[in-house]
Amino acid sequence: MKSSLPGALFQRVADWLRLLRAGNCAVVSLGAYTGYVAGRGGSLPQGVLVAASAALVAAWGNIVNDYFDLESDAISKPWRPLPSRRISPGSAVSASLPLLAAGLALGFLVSPLCGFTAVLASALLFLYSWRVKALGLPGNVLIAFLAALNVVYGALASPEPWRSLLPSAYAFLIILGREVLKGVEDLEGDAARGVKTVASTLGARAALRVSAVLLLAVVALSPLPLLSGYGALYALFAFGGVDAPIALALLKAGPEPRRAWIATRILKVPLLMGLLAFLVGGLA
């Protein structure tokens, strides 16, 4: 009996980390900190506070998303913590509220502007999970906007927040391009549920073209930061870690769901590498 306790505890912790989507929260934290650095923020404690605030609000949003997706996940993702009942919906909601409170409190601690921006982001996250996600393209646009807002959020704690415009544009275009392509991956299920994505309304090939335009816009933006002081480290991450994977994803993408699935997995790389490009470029 005693020997099973560590295993049970590990499983419990792992389930909560899956529910919170710890990896996603880490990327959100990185995005906010990147915005802070891009805006010439020089205080490590201030940057950590705004990054932690963003991660806590994101963790709350991830729980809310799974709560509203409980019925559909019971069919499509029964292994997730909530549909499998390894974590009860009530426990999840109860745990989410302190996360939200802490995230908002840290935001207001940084500045009133950051605090009110965190409140706005929280409201939009709730609306996304509750209603907008099921609308298809509006949900794609909203989640891309929230990714961009996260970068701006970090920059609002810095002296020159306008400098976050380029990294936030990166985030918006990459996320929106990927979300449109995911519509090809999920075409059959979205069509059956009446979700209005580009793919389900205009067809898979139209969605591929829209996604390609958005992602190629990222490639076109890549040289611009070099004109505003970013140097070789930025170029290394941007051209090698963003542009090259985008090119590979577009080559792999196709109207078949399997090919779209491969491309959307590749597109996880340029978002992370794009943030790192602006982070290391801003610190150099």
Curated annotation (Swiss-Prot):
Q: List the catalysed reactions.
A: sn-3-O-(geranylgeranyl)glycerol 1-phosphate + (2E,6E,10E)-geranylgeranyl diphosphate = 2,3-bis-O-(geranylgeranyl)-sn-glycerol 1-phosphate + diphosphate
Q: Which UniProt keywords apply?
A: Cell membrane, Lipid biosynthesis, Lipid metabolism, Magnesium, Membrane, Phospholipid biosynthesis, Phospholipid metabolism, Transferase, Transmembrane, Transmembrane helix
UniProt superkingdom: Archaea
Segments traversing the membrane: 44-64, 99-119, 137-157, 164-184, 210-230, 231-251, 260-280
Asked whether the keyword Transmembrane is assigned, the reply is yes
Cellular location(s): Cell membrane
Q: Required co-factor?
A: Mg(2+)
EC class of the enzyme, as a word: transferase
Per the record, the pathway is: Membrane lipid metabolism; glycerophospholipid metabolism
Record-level GO BP terms: glycerophospholipid biosynthetic process
Q: Name one GO cellular component term.
A: plasma membrane
Q: What does this protein do?
A: Prenyltransferase that catalyzes the transfer of the geranylgeranyl moiety of geranylgeranyl diphosphate (GGPP) to the C2 hydroxyl of (S)-3-O-geranylgeranylglyceryl phosphate (GGGP). This reaction is the second ether-bond-formation step in the biosynthesis of archaeal membrane lipids.
Q: What protein family is recorded?
A: Belongs to the UbiA prenyltransferase family. DGGGP synthase subfamily.
Protein name as annotated: Digeranylgeranylglyceryl phosphate synthase
Name its species. Thermofilum pendens (strain DSM 2475 / Hrk 5)
Q: Lineage from the top down? A: Archaea, Thermoproteota, Thermoprotei, Thermofilales, Thermofilaceae
